[in-house]
């Protein structure tokens, strides 16, 4: 799938604009602060109903404007189109519409418009808390395993019930046992989906990474959130007193993590910033391949400031891999000359100059 039309109104400093992007490579260039990243943010808002730059959406709404709106027309892989719209009012009301109908949840957007973001904060995938890596993992599982979302919702409900009981002691023994059983069943299902996903992801990640950078010995492993040699029911029983003291459940899928190690160390501790960026890119590109295999569709990639941290050789290698995905890519940079060479002649490339919030489409540099 790809976006064939994007309409943006009152998003940060951007002037109202309608973009007709290329189905493949789109390069947005201009000075720092011109609004390039805000274009990526608008697409992200359309696909996930949230910003990647702010946990609150009020800062995204242009000054003195009552609301921001992003509309998109999606070219579906199986043919036909789908119209998506997201609007956020300053007073807090949020509207999501799909083909003219109100949507029930942002998950419907995510399913129709799978997005991959690579930006300066992407280092957090290696350096940050386990929660960030769980989000990465579960994004991938969600897009290849349709049974994952219902299982995840059951897990969250069971965890809320158990944690409430741990804090307040309001459940009778029979109810406690019932919720523990539900927690263990949902946990086993989630763990199975995650393990299967990592088994499929690892060889694709390793192959992709080898095309970007030589990092012999880098390993990717999955920790499920409790002892691999014990059943969760047993672990919960043995840690009950500690869970009550802490007020929440210590073991389970909510504690899962992905571990990237090199020479016995956490990869983030010994890799350079450029190497870390390439590892993150390899993970994101590998996810894109799995989405394509499972859905017979494609992710849309948002790559903010692609040239940063990379020399010419690695920049070209990354562009080549993004191009080989045959998906739609939006790339920002200050100087588009850094990205002018290396694309295949048959690959459609669109250039957009961004200056003080105004966006103008310029000619493909190869014409």
UniProtKB/Swiss-Prot annotation:
Keywords assigned by UniProt, alphabetized: ATP-binding, Cytoplasm, DNA damage, DNA repair, DNA replication, DNA-binding, Nucleotide-binding, SOS response
GO biological process, one term: DNA synthesis involved in DNA repair
Family annotation (InterPro entries): DNA-binding_RecF, DNA-binding_RecF_CS, P-loop_NTPase, RecF/RecN/SMC_N, RecF_2
Principal subcellular localisation of the protein: cytoplasm
Binding-site positions, ATP: 30-37
Family: Belongs to the RecF family.
HAMAP family named among the record's database cross-references: RecF
Protein name: DNA replication and repair protein RecF
Native source species: Pseudomonas putida (strain GB-1)
Source lineage: Bacteria, Pseudomonadati, Pseudomonadota, Gammaproteobacteria, Pseudomonadales
Gene name, Swiss-Prot/TrEMBL: recF
